[in-house]
């Protein structure tokens, strides 16, 4: 069993009770994946909702400063502190909600327990009155091939780090440097 990747130390600290909260940045899963592998809550908030001042970016459009906690309630409290605003519930009843669920690509390779949990959640939302509509998004099948030679985050990372690499390439970890 592995504890995850990027923020796995923070995830283990929270999961074992050594820390109340683990802070980090999340671009493509650095908070959510270790949280999932350690059985805790990882919450990626809306981009630019929490200031990232002082953080070295991987992706200027996708990076978020966020947290891992042991419960959803704790995640809400920490998020409210980080974002300096209260989390409010939507005043609209669920019967007025219309949610689209992609029926292609995104759900294709889910592990069976994850797929069951996802569909149970959809059923719960339906019973609560939400209108759930499955929609095909055939163009998403092209995402993998489109990103074979890099993604938005790779391009943004290269643009941000290029001036530093020109001056201080030897100070970068070689593995990080090659990825940029």
Predicted regions and their residues:
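Short glycine/serine-rich loop segments
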Residues: 1-79
């Amino acid at each position: 069993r592995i504890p995850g990747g990027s923020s796995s130390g923070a995830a283990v600290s929270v999961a074992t009770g050594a820390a109340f909260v683990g802070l980090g940045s999340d671009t493509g899963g650095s908070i959510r994946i270790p949280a999932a592998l350690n059985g805790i809550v990882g919450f990626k908030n809306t981009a630019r909702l929490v200031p990232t001042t002082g953080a070295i970016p991987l992706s200027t459009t996708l990076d978020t400063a966020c947290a891992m906690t042991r419960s959803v309630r704790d995640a809400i409290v920490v998020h409210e502190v980080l974002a300096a605003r209260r989390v409010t519930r939507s005043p609209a009843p669920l019967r007025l909600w219309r949610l689209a669920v992609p029926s292609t690509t995104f759900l294709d390779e889910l592990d069976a327990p994850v797929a069951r949990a996802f569909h149970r959640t959809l059923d719960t939302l339906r019973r609560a009155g939400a209108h759930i509509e499955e929609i095909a998004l055939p163009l998403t099948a092209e995402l993998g091939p489109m990103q074979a030679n890099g993604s938005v985050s790779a391009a943004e990372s290269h643009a941000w780090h290029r001036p530093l690499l020109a001056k201080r390439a030897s100070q970068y970890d070689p593995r990080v440097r090659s990825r940029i």
